[in-house]
């Protein structure tokens, strides 16, 4: 019988480090729920000591997620471990993941320490983490460049101290697959107590071989793989979990292992991460790219028509990509929309039916037929904007021509007030943004603007994603409409609401901190 490979997702911790704009607590919860539905065994959701916001998001996810083990990162520092435990204690069970560098370069130049001191510190911190939970993971940072004898000493000591998972990361993406396999097998040969812990691997894609390294390590005995959906992460990214998962499934004949992942949720989880993180998936991306199952060669097309297995080693359906697209019209009722969402695998908690149906009717009146991809796009926007809005675009009008200066007029609802403004700009989108800035007096700099079609044909929905800089922080906004100028305006209003909510959260955190301080003084 094949052994299980534990899937450890770090999209919300290591993956988030690559994003241009930080995710809100709500956005992180959306991703966490998608990962839970996909069946990841462990999800690393943040570094709680880094900021009050990260602490809050880890705590919220730990309180919500029930079917995956929630994990938080901590350096081998007492405060890190204590804060991680505090953020996770609302969960029924949790993991603390602590780490320290073990390579000669890192020990000498970063830690300015010795291997013996590193081992002593690792032992102390693993034991401290065990005071809070019986699920402790220890990572040897830069293990790929650590001599095997040194690595074996650290691993043996960490296991003796109580670590239940030992992670061997290729921190800088330097190791070749055959080298990585040798490291894993070398540890099995050298560490006498290695059977008391799960050996994990964490790979980076600097040389384009993160997935190959992970699979080589699994073949050599590793039984946990760490990575991120779509391979997102700093520098060249992390190991793409969907690729590892499907490689294990498709090549079970030689891998002789399995995962507990619900493969039919891979596509939707990948799309959720892509859209919320504002990181488009390349068309030629393995498993989840739009071209992953496309065949343009005549010979290939003929072979697929005769037998799909001629050129397809897996089916689109195996990752949850439904190629049968149905359409609804303005005559379709709420029950029909709800039924179609259920057929596509969505749960009622994934969207607000009232809001979705209102948006559906408006779109159906404009374009006649609404397809599955339209519904999914509407549901995504619906989820992003379901919180109460302080700002709302009530009206806009734009005048623009090839030789005219673009002029925009807007009516913006700001809390209990309605404000109107007009402005000129370098094109219709810039004119609207200038008018909005005049209303709010927010000093916003547009950093990135992206437009993507959600569907096919001239009446396809256009999704605009923008990233702005405001007071040294970056915020992401998204808008959706058949009119790209309207999409652009909605994206900026979404940004305004995100800025406003962030300010409200900051006020609440300050209030809690002040109350805590007052309570201390009272005691």
Swiss-Prot record:
CDD domains: DRE_TIM_IPMS. Residues 5-267 form the Pyruvate carboxyltransferase domain. Its cofactor is Mn(2+). The keyword Metal-binding applies. The keyword Phosphoprotein does not apply. GO terms for cellular component: cytosol. Coiled coil: none annotated. Residues 392-523 are annotated as: Regulatory domain. Catalyzes the condensation of the acetyl group of acetyl-CoA with 3-methyl-2-oxobutanoate (2-ketoisovalerate) to form 3-carboxy-3-hydroxy-4-methylpentanoate (2-isopropylmalate). HAMAP family: LeuA_type1 (MF_01025). Homodimer. This is 2-isopropylmalate synthase. It comes from Klebsiella pneumoniae (strain 342). The gene is leuA.
């Amino acid at each position: 019988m094949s052994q299980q490979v534990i899937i450890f997702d770090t999209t919300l911790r290591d993956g988030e480090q690559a994003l241009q704009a930080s995710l809100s607590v709500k956005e992180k919860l959306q991703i966490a729920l998608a990962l839970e539905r996909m069946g990841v065994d462990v999800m690393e959701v943040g570094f709680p000591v880094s900021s009050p916001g990260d602490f809050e998001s880890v705590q919220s996810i730990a309180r919500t997620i029930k079917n995956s083990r929630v994990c938080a990162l901590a350096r081998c520092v007492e405060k890190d471990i204590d804060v991680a435990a505090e953020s996770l204690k609302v969960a029924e069970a949790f993991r603390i993941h602590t780490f320290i560098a073990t390579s000669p370069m890192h020990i000498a130049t970063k830690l300015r320490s010795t291997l013996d001191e590193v081992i002593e510190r690792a032992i102390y911190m693993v034991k401290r983490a065990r005071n809070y939970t019986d699920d402790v993971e220890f990572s040897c940072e830069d293990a790929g460049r650590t001599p095997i004898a040194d690595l074996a000493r650290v691993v043996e000591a960490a296991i003796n101290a109580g670590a239940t998972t030992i992670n061997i990361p290729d921190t800088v993406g330097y190791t070749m697959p055959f080298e990585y396999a040798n490291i894993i097998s070398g540890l099995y040969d050298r560490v006498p107590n290695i059977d008391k812990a799960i050996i994990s691997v964490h790979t980076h894609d600097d040389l384009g071989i993160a997935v190959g390294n992970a699979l080589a390590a699994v073949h050599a005995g590793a039984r946990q793989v760490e990575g991120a959906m779509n391979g997102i992460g700093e520098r060249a990214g992390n190991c793409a979990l969907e690729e590892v998962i499907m490689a294990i499934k498709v090549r079970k004949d030689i891998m002789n292992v399995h995962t507990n992942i619900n493969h039919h949720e891979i596509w939707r989880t990948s799309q959720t991460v892509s859209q919320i993180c504002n990181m488009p998936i390349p068309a030629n991306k393995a498993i989840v790219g739009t071209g992953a199952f496309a065949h343009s060669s005549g010979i290939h097309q003929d072979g697929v028509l005769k037998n799909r297995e001629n050129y397809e080693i897996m089916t689109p359906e195996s990752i949850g990509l439904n190629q049968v697209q149905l359409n609804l019209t303005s005559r379709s009722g709420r029950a029909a929309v709800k039924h179609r969402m259920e057929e596509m695998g969505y749960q009622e908690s994934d969207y607000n039916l009232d809001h979705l149906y209102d948006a559906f009717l408006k779109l159906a009146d404009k374009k006649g037929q609404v397809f599955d991809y339209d519904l999914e796009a509407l549901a995504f926007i619906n989820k992003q904007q379901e919180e109460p809005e302080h700002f709302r675009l009530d009206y806009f009008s734009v005048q623009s021509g090839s030789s005219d200066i673009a002029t925009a007029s807007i009516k913006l609802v700001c809390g209990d007030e309605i404000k109107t403004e007009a402005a000129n700009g370098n094109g219709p989108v810039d004119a609207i943004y200038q008018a909005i800035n005049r209303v709010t007096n927010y000093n916003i700099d547009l950093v990135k603007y992206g437009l993507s079609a959600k569907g096919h044909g001239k009446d396809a929905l256009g999704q605009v994603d923008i990233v702005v800089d405001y007071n040294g922080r970056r915020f992401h906004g998204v808008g959706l409409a058949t009119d790209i100028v309207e999409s652009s305006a909605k994206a900026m209003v979404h940004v305004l609401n995100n800025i406003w909510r962030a300010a409200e959260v900051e006020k609440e955190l300050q209030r809690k901190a002040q109350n805590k301080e007052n309570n201390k003084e009272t005691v």
